[in-house]
Amino acid sequence: GWCFGAPKPGGRVWVIDRDAPAIWTGSTWLLGAMGAAPGGAATAAKLIVGDHQIAAGTVSTTALAIPDRAVVIGVTARVSEEIVGAGLTGWRLGVAGAEDRYGSSIGLAVGSIVNGVTGTPVAYYADTPLQLEAQGGAFAGGAVRLAIHFLELTPPV
């Protein structure tokens, strides 16, 4: 049977419906926390996943965004619907001003992947959408599933 008791600071659980770990700080559960300190400071590993339908043009900006204050470890993606377009040879994945930060010359076929590990973790100070940029031509359509892998810092209370 089950035995129930009050959690102690530093106690860890797995939250099934969120598919993530949580740590008890003594006053609240911190979802995704890798570590927490007395006073509420914590570091959490987070992941945001979303699908993106590619619109016609040379650049396709996602609704999925890197959160404000995120320290990004990398961005991964998989082509879920063939990416098509006249003259298209591949695509880049990045953000405005760093169009290939997470990958370039990425395949167009269903199942093509990008594992865009950030060479040095990058901090973002505003919500920042991802950008797909066409190489060799322009997008006419297609779809990708994207995942943003990042750290989130929680200051002490």
Where are these regions (language model features)?
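Glycine-rich, low-complexity segments
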Residues: 19-58, 155-157
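Short, surface-exposed secondary-structure edge patches
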Residues: 2-7, 63, 67-69, 121-122
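C-terminal interaction-tip segments
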Residues: 41-42, 137-157
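Short hydrophobic/aromatic-rich beta-strand motifs
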Residues: 1-24
